[in-house]
Amino acid sequence: MRKAIIAGNWKMNKNLEDALELVEELKPLVRGAKCDVVLCPPYVCLDAVVKSVGGTNIKVGAQNMHYEESGAYTGEISPGMLKSLKVDYVIIGHSERRQYFNEKDETINKKIKKAFEHDIIPIVCCGESLLERENGITEEVLGRQIKLALKDLRKEQVEKIVIAYEPIWAIGTGKTATDKQANDTIAHIRGVVSKMYGENAAEVVRIQYGGSVKPATIKAQMEQPHIDGALVGGASLKPQDFAAIVNY
């Protein structure tokens, strides 16, 4: 039985004071959660948030990282830096990174491997555009993304990975894939993993849905057999809303 995981991606929101205020309000609201709870604040808030949630059931993730340990990469953060802050997770390959920063599947693969070297769990994102869905190539696009992202990993690494299916057309638009669309697409992703690393790995890997997730939609989504959680954007910035999603 796969344990659900709900992660909040704050994106480029919240200064340090606002971040700590949000966390303090959230902590008692999710104390009894049956799922894994992860917060992914901006880099500048990571250290303070890690310290604030110490001793609670909340884990902390970063929103991105570089695949090199150090060097002349102005503005970048290394996996070793994240590990020194006691970060447990890192989002890799978010659609906004692909769109605005031209991040490629091969780069994502390098980041995944480097995250594992530092015992950081990758939340690996994949998803299709509206045009790709309308053209009927969703499965082809996702298959390519997953095959390249998970290339040359060990089976035990794949079993630890969290995959987030985020239809690009549903991010920040208010549009949401139907529960059946989301479940069927995630089932396809699981099938790709099965062909690469075997049925056991595919059954163990946790796959989230991420696309305008709200308190009103989460319960039905979590009733789908292949959906193991959510990567939450805007709703994670509101403690009451995020808690309602966590406590679905």
From Swiss-Prot:
Keywords: Cytoplasm, Gluconeogenesis, Glycolysis, Isomerase
Record's GO cellular component terms: cytosol
Pathway field: Carbohydrate biosynthesis; gluconeogenesis; Carbohydrate degradation; glycolysis; D-glyceraldehyde 3-phosphate from glycerone phosphate: step 1/1
GO process terms (BP): gluconeogenesis; glyceraldehyde-3-phosphate biosynthetic process; glycerol catabolic process; glycolytic process
Superkingdom of source: Bacteria
Keyword match Transmembrane helix: no
Catalytic activity from the UniProt record: D-glyceraldehyde 3-phosphate = dihydroxyacetone phosphate
Keyword Ribonucleoprotein: no
Catalytic center residues: H94, E166
GO MF, one annotated term: triose-phosphate isomerase activity
Listed CDD domains: TIM
Catalytic activity, EC: 5.3.1.1
Cell compartment(s), UniProt: Cytoplasm
Database matches in InterPro entries: Aldolase_TIM, TIM_sf, TrioseP_Isoase_bac/euk, Triosephosphate_isomerase, Triosephosphate_isomerase_AS
Ligand binding (substrate): N9, W10, K11, G172, S212, G233, G234
Similarity-based family: Belongs to the triosephosphate isomerase family.
General function of this protein: Involved in the gluconeogenesis. Catalyzes stereospecifically the conversion of dihydroxyacetone phosphate (DHAP) to D-glyceraldehyde-3-phosphate (G3P).
Subunit structure: Homodimer.
Name used for this protein in its record: Triosephosphate isomerase
